[in-house]
Amino acid sequence: MKPSIQSRLEQLVERFEEVNALLSDASVIANQDKFRDLSREFAEIEPVVKCFQAWRQSLEDIDAATELAKDGDADMREMAEEELASARARSEELDEELQRLMLPKDPNDTKNVFLEIRAGTGGDEAAIFAGDLFRMYSRYAEKRRWQVEVLSENEGEHGGFKEIIARLSGDGVYGTLKFESGAHRVQRVPETESQGRIHTSACTVAVMPEADEAEAVEINKADLRVDTFRSSGAGGQHVNKTDSAIRITHLPTGIVVECQEERSQHKNRAKALSLLASRLQNAELEKQQKSMAETRKSLVGSGDRSERIRTYNFPQGRVTDHRINLTLYKLDEVIAGDLDAVVVPLQQEHQAELLADMANEQQ
């Protein structure tokens, strides 16, 4: 391990002990915000510190086994050599694990997200596919114990959605779903197709981290046009009786957001403003990512909505992620919400890219 990394890890151990002590301090416990921030920091540092301590222990085990191997007794030497081989293997594994744990963290990974799905080419079939995708993400969210809150929906004439926007909240939502942004393509025989021909349709998916209040983009009220209209969504007897739905247009950028799911105009307005702040922040993030991509092409992290990232082929029961050449013949499971089969390989590929970058920087 490089001395610079070891020095950084030793500083982390000191900080870990400091945070641990602070979490027992009565004044910190009384301050909910500070206690929450320190608890989050403790949870982030703990696995790194534990791994580093185990790695240092493995070095001590190597030294002890090396000394023991010098013993004149043949049985003792044999036992020491076995322990030495085991300790070295353990040390290498822990070294690799530490490198992974030391990779730069995306500060957005822990955030909630706004998920936007829009039907693209393919008319009614694209809208039906948008519905399938939303159901897939909803079922996956259920498995992860995330909350799903629909903010706006525009239903297709024959089912599904022309557009649907939802907020997903829970542990690590953005870190899990951030590689879902892009164009998703479906190949299947529509129910209305009498000739049995396979049609190709597409939807675009955008996953945006929810902007924190502290870092939200400042929005000048003079830059906004706010329109009210009658909700067209579900709601039984309350639908269309009041202009509770909100549409906000950000005049400098032309970005338009809507929220119509609440009966209260104030709640719809607050949610629409939150979505607008995230859209504006995401536009800035995309600009930065584009700039970074010019210097280093990332396979999985570009987040370009126009980029075709995945194909769902129903006749063959196949899902293909084009960025990492991943092909799975388990379409039914994936579309039913078993997204880990796709998400985990994408995260591993991204991790491998970061490790390669780290290795290049250390050369």
Swiss-Prot record:
Belongs to the prokaryotic/mitochondrial release factor family. The gene is prfA. It is found in: Cytoplasm. Methylated by PrmC. Methylation increases the termination efficiency of RF1. The keyword Metal-binding does not apply. InterPro entries: PCRF (IPR005139), Pep_chain_release_fac_I (IPR000352), Pep_chain_release_fac_I_sf (IPR045853), Prokaryotic/Mito_RF (IPR050057), RF-1 (IPR004373). The modification N5-methylglutamine is found at residue 237. One of its GO terms (molecular function) is translation release factor activity, codon specific. It comes from Marinobacter nauticus (strain ATCC 700491 / DSM 11845 / VT8). SMART domains: PCRF (SM00937). One of its GO terms (cellular component) is cytoplasm. Its main location: cytoplasm. This is Peptide chain release factor 1. Disulfide bonds: none annotated. Keywords: Cytoplasm, Methylation, Protein biosynthesis. Peptide chain release factor 1 directs the termination of translation in response to the peptide chain termination codons UAG and UAA.
